[in-house]
């Protein structure tokens, strides 16, 4: 039996018939965790990093497009933050609440009870970590193996930048990349509108010649120095686990440019605005799509569950894992 399928068998011993996303995502996470020589994890997470604007807990309504498998990146994040035991704790919690089809609420409860944090706080950190992938990897800031992961999709932009009401679904993020030019500092802020933007978070991540630097959360127009900075990423994050999508107007540039942008902002007219939030001439990096929400796509090239088979060493590790989980069960 392949390692992926063996973990499904272990899942069934705890709580059969769970949400497709949590079932497939934790199975892919486990395959990578116990047999990192396989390439399934890196192949699957590309789908997530190509579409960070999708809500992490909403599965496609049509054919499975690989997105449920790609959410394994979130469980890798939790593993690196809190250790692999958190996945076992999740399945134990799902066993205790078999009639509750809400794995995000279960994760939130575990984080609150056992780790002193929340899904909202951790999703925000997760979205920031995803900047540190591919050539922007920095293990001092995020994933230890981030250099092996695909780049998160981002949009090329020029300053000053006005993002006109991009749709921000619950538990999703969007990214823009720009050069600071001759500005000494860069900041960002939400422009006043009639739209509810409570809970939305803004982060700036500067990059220098040799490394992507520490991320900076923008609070009250925090000014970020551009000294030794070649480029910068803006992460707009909706970390909320429930609620309708948010439609912010975001101003980015020097402090003076941001103040002027906010002064010129008009309350929304109830229209849809620029759903992509993409400036004229913007280009997506890493093959991402600016469209929000969920849509069916082609099946992943690596296939579904039946495509996963581990090396003999991995199968042995999985057998030991299954026995360990079953004994604790």
Where are these regions (language model features)?
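Beta/coil-rich, acidic/histidine-enriched accessory regions frequently appended to metallopeptidases
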Residues: 97-279, 284
């Amino acid at each position: 039996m392949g390692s992926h399928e063996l973990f499904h068998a272990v899942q069934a011993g705890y709580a059969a018939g769970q949400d497709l996303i949590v079932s497939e995502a934790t199975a892919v996470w486990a395959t990578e965790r116990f047999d990192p020589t396989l390439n399934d994890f890196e192949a699957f997470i590309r789908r997530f990093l190509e579409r960070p604007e999708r809500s992490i807990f909403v599965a496609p309504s049509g054919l499975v497009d690989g997105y449920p498998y790609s959410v394994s990146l979130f469980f890798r994040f939790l593993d690196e933050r809190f250790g692999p035991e958190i996945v076992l704790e999740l399945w134990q919690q799902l066993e205790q609440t078999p009639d509750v089809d809400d794995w995000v609420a279960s994760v939130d409860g575990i984080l609150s009870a056992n780790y002193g944090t929340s899904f909202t706080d951790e999703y925000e950190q997760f979205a920031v970590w995803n900047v540190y992938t591919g050539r922007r990897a920095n293990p001092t800031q995020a994933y230890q193996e981030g250099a092996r992961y695909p780049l998160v999709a981002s949009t090329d932009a020029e300053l000053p930048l006005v993002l006109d009401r991009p749709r921000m679904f619950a538990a999703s993020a969007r990214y823009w990349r720009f050069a600071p030019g001759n500005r000494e500092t860069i900041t960002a802020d939400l422009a006043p509108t009639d739209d509810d933007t409570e809970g939305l978070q803004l982060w700036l991540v500067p990059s220098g010649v040799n490394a992507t630097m520490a991320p900076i959360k923008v609070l009250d127009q925090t000014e970020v120095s551009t000294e030794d900075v070649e480029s910068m990423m803006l992460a707009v994050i909706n970390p909320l686990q429930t609620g309708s999508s948010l439609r912010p107007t975001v101003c980015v540039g020097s402090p003076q440019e941001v103040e002027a942008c906010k002064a010129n902002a008009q309350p929304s007219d109830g229209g849809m605005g620029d759903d992509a939030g993409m400036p004229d001439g913007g280009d997506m990096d890493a093959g991402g799509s600016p469209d929000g929400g969920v849509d069916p796509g082609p099946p992943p090239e690596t296939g579904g569950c039946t495509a996963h088979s581990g090396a003999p060493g991995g199968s042995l590790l999985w057998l030991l894992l299954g026995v360990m989980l079953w004994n604790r069960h």
